[in-house]
Amino acid sequence: MLALLLGSCESTYYDAMEQIGIHKRDILIDRIVDAQEAQQDGQVQFKNALEQFRSVVNFDGGELETIYDRLNGEYEDSVSAAEEIRDRIDAVESVADALFDEWTTKLGQYWSANLRRESERQLKNTKSRYTRLLTAMRRAERSIEPVLATCMTTSCT
């Protein structure tokens, strides 16, 4: 039931955006850029967390609680970055699904068989490129979990 409700909300959103001249393909492009930026930000965050961890490995005394708080903060920021990446990729997937559904529906509206075949070819090529992009994004997302798990088990929290 919730999926049906959320799907209709997204459909309403896309319809409203199209009314003001912003098409699903434009939303898709924006969401891909947002996801890529989130991945880059996440990469920076993980690098910062690693640097903080390395500084503790060479720890020679001092305020243990301060160091723990700093490491825990880096870990929490890394978890947030991972969630942001996941959310951005999910948003890309959502608008892409809506775009491809609309495109498929419109194929049945062509009067010309040649134009329909050309649009089907473009749809197939676009889906193929999108699938490669989404696969790469999901692979990058999956690579984050082992880093977080390692950080969690090696005194980052």
Predicted features along the sequence, with ranges:
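Bacterial signal peptide processing site
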Residues: 10-13
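C-terminal motif of bacterial Sec signal peptides marking the signal peptidase cleavage site
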Residues: 5-8
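Sec-dependent signal peptide recognition
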Residues: 1-2
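Extended amphipathic alpha-helical interaction segments
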Residues: 88-157
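Primarily heptad-repeat coiled-coil rod domains in cytosolic scaffolding/tethering proteins
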Residues: 16, 23, 30, 59, ...
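Early exported N-terminus immediately downstream of N-terminal targeting peptides
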Residues: 25, 29-107
